[in-house]
């Protein structure tokens, strides 16, 4: 692996977003809620091998955009980008991406508060729902212009921006795969 051993112990938690999405579907079904919900679990085995991604590889995301790999540790967003594009084919009213996307979120908000980013309306509704259920969430912006840190000379964008604003930058990257008008 490319991570230091101390960080590898935490990687089993990288599937927490997919687990939360799956459990949400089970809970909705058990409660018999009158809603139509689909969960897209963006799953991948991340192991080094001769066919693993390398720095400077250019990948084509589902839907056609190309991404230059500049950081092999920013791999989760590549899988999520595929899932976001595919999920939009179902014309959903709302897409909620649940992910342990970046350690920058923990640096910014600690271990108990989740950062929430998105359109103002959707983000605010999620924060209110979280408050009602006792889950601390904090609304975060997606600064305009943040996507410029993902500029690439060989692809539509890179998979990693600069070091500042890591959580916000990761969201700006994923926003590139969501069509205008989708919440």
Regions found by a protein language model. Give the residues of each.
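A generic structural signal for tightly packed, nonpolar segments enriched in small/aliphatic residues
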Residues: 1-183
């Amino acid at each position: 692996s490319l991570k230091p051993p101390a960080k590898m112990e935490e990687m089993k938690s990288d599937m927490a977003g997919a687990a939360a999405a799956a459990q949400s579907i089970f809970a909705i079904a058990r409660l018999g809620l009158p809603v139509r919900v689909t969960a897209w679990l963006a799953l991948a085995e991340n192991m080094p091998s001769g066919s693993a991604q390398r720095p400077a590889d250019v990948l084509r995301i589902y839907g056609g955009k190309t991404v230059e790999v500049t950081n092999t540790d920013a791999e989760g967003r590549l899988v999520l980008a595929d899932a976001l594009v595919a999920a939009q084919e179902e014309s959903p009213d709302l897409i909620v991406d649940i992910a342990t996307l970046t350690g920058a979120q923990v640096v910014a908000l600690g271990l108990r508060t989740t950062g929430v980013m998105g359109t103002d309306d959707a983000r605010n509704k999620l924060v209110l729902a979280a408050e009602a259920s006792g889950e601390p969430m904090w609304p975060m912006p997606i600064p305009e212009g943040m996507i410029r840190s993902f500029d690439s000379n060989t692809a539509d964008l890179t998979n990693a921006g600069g070091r500042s604003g890591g959580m916000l930058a990761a969201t700006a990257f994923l926003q590139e795969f969501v069509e205008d008008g989708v919440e």
